[in-house]
Amino acid sequence: MQVTVNLDYKNYIFDLYGTIIDIHTEEGERKLWKALAKYYRKHGAFYFACGIRRGYHKFVNEELKKSEEIQVEKVFKKLFEVKGVDADDTLVAETCRYFRDTSTYHLRLYEWSLPILQKLKENGKKVYLLSNAQRSFTYHEMEKLDIVKYFDKIYISSDYGVKKPNPKFFQILMEKVGVDAKESLFLGNDQTCDILGAQSVGMDTWYVHTNCSPEYTEDVKATYEFLIPETSKRN
């Protein structure tokens, strides 16, 4: 499938999951929590599946009371601490990766992702990432898919305690790299987080409706739209 993007802009700012990366994770299945409990027991923290799942959600909710975006590393570290295990940064990072890998069913690029990124770089455009995500999950996945090299700067919500559609997250990127909204195009698959969020700071927008997108509404109008035919969507 060939997808073309208007090359009249200086800056191109991408969402990640559901826009560039096609991902399916499942955190609701018992086998994930059984595996995580076993992992914690291996490192001296005794849990069964129900207990670690309950503890995980408890600590996530506690972190969300402090900030609209959390750092999931703090959650996994607390799960060790309450069992008397002093987990160092290396163990916490490994735990984050284990959780993510175990809960991921598929991770791949959409067929248009590389051609667009390559075309933008070939034409000397600035390419940035602005993603609602956890750095401990995301950077590893981007490295695995070999796409880090296409981005001039990467901004992940867990680093800043704020996320889309909050204009503050967009403004962080704009201020740090000196981006002019009028010279920028935001590309994303979520009409609220990506399109309305980018429009709130004056950016033009390119909406792509993928298998990971929330239900489409005609009430939100992007500058450009690409609606994937049902037969082209991945299952």
Regions found by a protein language model. Give the residues of each.
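Asp-based, Mg2+/Mn2+-dependent phosphohydrolase catalytic module
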Residues: 1-12, 22-23, 46-47, 90, ...
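N-terminal helical cap/lid subdomain that shapes the substrate entry/recognition surface
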Residues: 3-111, 115
